[in-house]
């Protein structure tokens, strides 16, 4: 029998039946729900007279619309100023209460961003199929799981049947060997990958991340990388199970205990690609050559090393690409030949499902300790990804490091990653952001997003412009 990839194993374990059109019916182990893509799904169940098939497979929490300031959060749902946002959060509460679904509500200390809460509670585990009405559900693949985003109609299907019709994707291996240099993080690695293969490079593939760099990477780092597999065009990203995975999962609230843990661990240790597995495509990078990255344009593939200069569309031989570069430069207010380190920032956002875990908060705090936010920076905010992250950071005194630097410490939520709540950019403002998308208007109408690591964002908050974190740390 031919060797199988990690994705092959996860897929095969969950196929219920194969259909004549080449698609399969697959079983879903875990369903994560938030307030934005679930209301129509719950209403569809209600209209059809159906109930969720397995309420114990569902975990819900509001994240996109929740305010992140202490004053707003003190009033719970009533503190949400926007009426549409308030309705969405209240509707999630009502649906979960009615159907008996576990929900971490707005003032529950377990509330947070779905892609942070799932792994940290043990709600998402190795070997699972995991879905959520959110494209960044790929995050959970870092645990050795098959995890991907679905649409609202599919949310209803999974609630009703615990199954989903899907077509198997092709296999891609992205292998990064060598050792990362000082100041180079998981965020820089995934941005470098996207710069290399483009935002369509992973289309139709499930990506496995392998090689020396990922074997040495923390679970928080792996979660960051798999989170942005979708920005590389793939629906799912994943990393093989190893000791780092098992150490992370063990003891978490929903993780197996006692004899069940021993059985689960034995099974999970098989979740890796076989030595003779064949991938449809293999991409290789040298980790030692990756530098701290900064996005300059309006697509996650428009990324440069921090010591780079803004490209000139006149030097682009492909007319379509040249037009895209020109359009991006116009929107971003940048000029060809401008140094990345000469770009001034108006706001700084450290948070999102990409970079709001405790490792990210620690990295940012290390940079700003004993310093003060630049006067030219209008606002810098740090938004932990969950109540658990917030509590851990506060226990370590990290919140006080930020506030002493005139950087705001907030409540958990998606925040400035997307303009669906009160945290957003003004027109023309440049933001050093640890989020995952830099599309036009993503963080607010006319806002200009630069994707960076937490350390790079923190350094920009202090300096007022981008700096090479390697020099900062030397």
Curated annotation (Swiss-Prot):
Catalytic activity field: (2R,3S)-3-isopropylmalate = (2S)-2-isopropylmalate
- Annotated S-S bridges: none
Supply the InterPro entries for this chain. Answer: 3-IsopropMal_deHydase_lsu, Acnase/IPM_dHydase_lsu_aba_1/3, Acoase/IPM_deHydtase_lsu_aba, Aconitase_4Fe-4S_BS, Aconitase_4Fe-4S_dom, IPM_dehydratase_rel_enz, IPMI_cat
SUPFAM superfamilies tied to this protein: Aconitase iron-sulfur domain (SSF53732)
Cofactors that this protein relies on: [4Fe-4S] cluster
Free-text comment on the cofactor: Binds 1 [4Fe-4S] cluster per subunit.
A Gene Ontology annotation in the biological process aspect, one of them, is: L-leucine biosynthetic process
Residues recorded as binding [4Fe-4S] cluster, renumbered to this chain, are 353, 414, 417
| Segments forming a coiled coil | none
Name the UniProt key words of this record, in alphabetical order: 4Fe-4S, Amino-acid biosynthesis, Branched-chain amino acid biosynthesis, Iron, Iron-sulfur, Leucine biosynthesis, Lyase, Metal-binding
Keyword Amino-acid biosynthesis in annotation:
yes
E.C. code: 4.2.1.33
State which pathway it belongs to: Amino-acid biosynthesis; L-leucine biosynthesis; L-leucine from 3-methyl-2-oxobutanoate: step 2/4
Q: Which PANTHER family match?
A: 3-ISOPROPYLMALATE DEHYDRATASE, HOMOACONITASE, MITOCHONDRIAL-RELATED
Give the family from UniProt.
Belongs to the aconitase/IPM isomerase family. LeuC type 1 subfamily.
How it assembles, according to the record, is:
Heterodimer of LeuC and LeuD.
> What function is annotated for this protein?
Catalyzes the isomerization between 2-isopropylmalate and 3-isopropylmalate, via the formation of 2-isopropylmaleate.
Name used for this protein in its record:
3-isopropylmalate dehydratase large subunit
Q: Name its species.
A: Teredinibacter turnerae (strain ATCC 39867 / T7901)
Source lineage = Bacteria, Pseudomonadati, Pseudomonadota, Gammaproteobacteria, Cellvibrionales
């Amino acid at each position: 029998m031919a060797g199988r990839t990690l994705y092959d194993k996860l897929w095969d374990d969950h196929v219920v039946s194969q259909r004549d059109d080449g698609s399969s019916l697959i079983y879903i182990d875990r369903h994560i729900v938030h307030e934005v893509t679930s209301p129509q799904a719950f209403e569809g169940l209600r209209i059809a007279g159906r109930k969720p098939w397995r309420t114990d497979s569902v975990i819900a929490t509001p994240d996109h619309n929740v305010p992140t300031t202490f004053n707003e959060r003190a009033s719970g749902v009533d503190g949400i100023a926007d009426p549409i946002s308030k309705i969405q959060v209240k509707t999630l509460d009502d649906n979960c209460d009615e159907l008996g679904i576990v929900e971490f509500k707005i003032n529950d200390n377990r509330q947070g961003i779905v892609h942070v809460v799932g792994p940290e509670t043990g709600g998402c585990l190795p070997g699972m199929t995991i879905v959520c009405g959110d494209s960044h559900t790929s995050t959970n693949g870092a645990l050795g799981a098959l995890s991907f985003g679905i649409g609202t109609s599919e949310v209803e299907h999974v609630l009703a049947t615990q199954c989903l019709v899907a077509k198997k994707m092709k296999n891609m291996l992205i292998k990064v060997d060598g050792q990362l240099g000082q100041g180079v993080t998981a965020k820089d690695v995934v941005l470098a990958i996207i710069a290399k293969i483009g935002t369509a490079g992973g289309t139709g593939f499930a990506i496995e991340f392998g090689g020396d760099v990922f074997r040495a990477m923390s679970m928080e780092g792996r979660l960051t990388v798999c989170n942005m597999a979708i920005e590389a065009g793939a629906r799912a990203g994943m990393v093989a199970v190893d000791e780092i995975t098992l150490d992370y999962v063990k003891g978490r609230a929903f993780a197996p205990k006692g004899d069940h843990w021993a059985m689960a661990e034995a099974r999970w240790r098989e979740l890796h690609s076989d030595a003779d597995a064949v991938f449809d495509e293999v991409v290789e990078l040298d980790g030692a050559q990756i530098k701290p990255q900064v996005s300059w344009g309006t697509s996650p593939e428009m990324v440069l090393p921090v010591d780079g200069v803004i490209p000139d569309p006149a030097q682009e031989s492909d007319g379509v690409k040249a037009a895209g570069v020109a359009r991006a430069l116009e929107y971003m207010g940048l000029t060809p030949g401008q140094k990345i380190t000469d770009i001034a920032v108006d706001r700084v956002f450290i948070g999102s499902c990409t970079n709001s875990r405790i490792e990210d908060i620690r990295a940012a705090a290390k940079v700003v300790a004993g310093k003060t936010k630049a006067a030219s920076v209008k606002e810098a905010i740090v938004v932990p990804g969950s109540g658990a992250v917030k509590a851990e950071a506060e226990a370590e005194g990290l919140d006080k490091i930020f506030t002493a630097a005139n950087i705001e410490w907030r409540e958990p939520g998606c925040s400035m990653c997307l303009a669906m709540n009160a945290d957003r950019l003004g027109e023309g403002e440049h933001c050093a952001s640890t989020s995952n998308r830099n599309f036009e208007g993503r963080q607010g109408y006319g806002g200009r997003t630069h994707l960076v690591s937490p350390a790079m964002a923190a350094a920009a908050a202090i300096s007022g412009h981008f700096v090479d974190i390697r020099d900062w740390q030397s």
